[in-house]
A protein has these predicted regions:
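Histidine-acidic metal/acid-base catalytic patches
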Residues: 28, 83-103, 109-222
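Active-site acidic/histidine proton-transfer and metal-coordination neighborhood
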Residues: 1-101, 196, 200-204
Length: 222
């Protein structure tokens, strides 16, 4: 099992973080996805990385104390660690038994990072995979005329046969998390997440995604 903390969960010294990690230890939840460090336009990049790494070091200590692993998720956009290459700016030098890479194939598609290269970059830290589709949808009346958008599996730009076959070749045995983020609910996700509301038909689309994923996994393992 894995748990996902709020997007602003980046202070390891907070009471919330201390309790969160202790609760995961007590509940035998071994993987904890923390929040994101955002890049602000005009910031110097490497000092921003240094600040984020100091906070990540605190999460690594919490992981060691509670016998869990902290996960950093690749998320396209102005996020430190937005892709596999950038994520290694955060992770390099830390013990991979205490901190890991949670790669997201949908966001890799949006950022244009090659699957094989990205996985090779984070191979030492690879701990979990995020499963969602992503592509750039046309919006001809606006500038730019395309925008990032989520999609059901098989409807976006991710080559799922290649992605999953690469994981099999790497003997990856971590969790694959179906994110259930789709075109019809992107506004909801960006505003409030699913804590307070969810779009209609979510379970049905999610079930189709899981069936799609299992079908490819079966073909890949054959």
């Amino acid at each position: 099992p894995m748990t996902s903390a709020p997007v602003d969960f980046t202070d390891p010294t907070s009471t919330e973080a201390q309790r969160f990690y202790a609760a995961c230890e007590a509940a035998a939840v071994p993987l904890i996805k923390i929040g994101y460090w955002y890049y602000q336009e005009g910031d110097a990049y490497w000092p921003a990385i240094d600040r984020a790494r100091k906070e990540l070091e605190g999460f690594v200590r919490l992981s060691e104390k509670h016998g869990v692993k902290t996960l950093c998720h690749t998320h396209s956009g102005p996020v430190l660690g937005s892709n596999c290459a950038g994520l290694m700016h955060l992770l390099t030098g830390f013990d991979p038994s205490h901190v890991g890479a949670y790669i997201d194939f949908g966001h890799m598609a949006l950022d244009g990072e090659d699957l094989a290269m990205g996985l090779a970059i984070v191979v030492e830290y690879l701990s979990a995979g995020g499963i969602k589709g992503g592509f750039h949808a046309p919006q001809p009346e606006k500038t730019p005329p395309f925008r990032p958008q989520f999609a059901a599996l098989g409807a976006g730009s991710v080559d799922w046969h290649r992605a999953l076959s690469l994981l099999v070749k790497m003997n990856f045995d971590g969790p694959l998390c179906v994110h259930t983020e789709y075109e019809f609910d992107e506004t909801i996700i960006r505003q409030v997440g699913y804590a307070d509301t969810k779009p209609p038909g979510l379970e049905e689309v999610a079930q189709k995604d899981v069936a799609f994923l299992r079908g490819i996994l079966a073909e890949t393992a054959a």
